[in-house]
């Protein structure tokens, strides 16, 4: 039968002789575990931050783009909200001065962006634009170039719009894009009336989606990837 007393005495003696090595070993294990936990936590936080920033850049959880009109989609009923945009390059004019310039016209319908916001001067410009009527939001570069003011008229195709606000920033739009072809937002309801979208026009159609928090977007769209 084992002599447990002797075993304990030997173990205690070895422990006293090698206590510094044992403490170093235990400390290494503790530090290693702590490092693994910290790295794992950092990775999760980094992934979360990247996802959040991507949403801020897109202004939505998911964006579908096509050069043809995007009809009803299977995922429409799964989304909390959707918005649509039609954008294309076109000349716009300022009737007060007769000046004109190439711009990126964006006809918007819905509450896009779902993340971030359209920053305007005055701050009420976005709300005024969405309240209805022939209102437009005009990028600051364009406003400065033609010394335009909020309340002035801008002509897009055959329709005249009152400038409701000066656009300062838009989710997903770079400074280069704004310099080459500054954006002019108009309500989708008046797009057809402008007469600018005709057969053969180079037009891009966007559909924006926002889903419930923690929705796995990749898993959600997987069954429809071949269709898109």
Regions found by a protein language model. Give the residues of each.
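Membrane transport/envelope proteins' first extracytoplasmic loop
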Residues: 2-228
């Amino acid at each position: 039968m084992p002599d447990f007393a002797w075993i304990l005495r030997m173990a205690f003696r070895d422990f006293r002789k090698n206590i510094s090595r044992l403490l170093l070993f235990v400390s290494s294990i503790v530090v290693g575990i702590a490092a693994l936990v910290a790295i794992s936590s950092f990775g999760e936080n980094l992934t979360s931050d990247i996802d959040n920033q991507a949403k801020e850049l897109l202004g939505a959880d998911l964006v579908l783009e096509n050069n043809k009109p995007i009809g009803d989609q299977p995922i429409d009923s799964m989304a909390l909200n959707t918005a649509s945009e039609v954008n294309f390059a076109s000349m716009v004019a300022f009737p007060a001065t007769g000046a004109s310039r190439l711009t990126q016209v964006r006809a918007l319908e819905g509450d896009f962006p779902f993340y971030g916001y359209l920053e305007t001067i005055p701050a009420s410009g976005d709300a005024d634009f969405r309240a209805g009527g022939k209102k437009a939001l005009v990028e600051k570069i364009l406003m400065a170039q033609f010394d335009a003011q909020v309340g002035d008229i801008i002509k897009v195709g055959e329709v005249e719009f009152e400038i409701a606000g000066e656009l300062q920033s838009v989710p997903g739009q770079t400074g280069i894009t704004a310099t080459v072809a500054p954006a002019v937002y108009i309500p989708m309801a008046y797009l057809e009336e402008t007469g600018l979208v005709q057969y053969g026009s180079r037009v891009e159609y966007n559909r924006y989606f926002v889903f419930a928090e923690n929705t796995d977007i990749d898993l959600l769209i997987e069954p429809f990837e071949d269709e898109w």
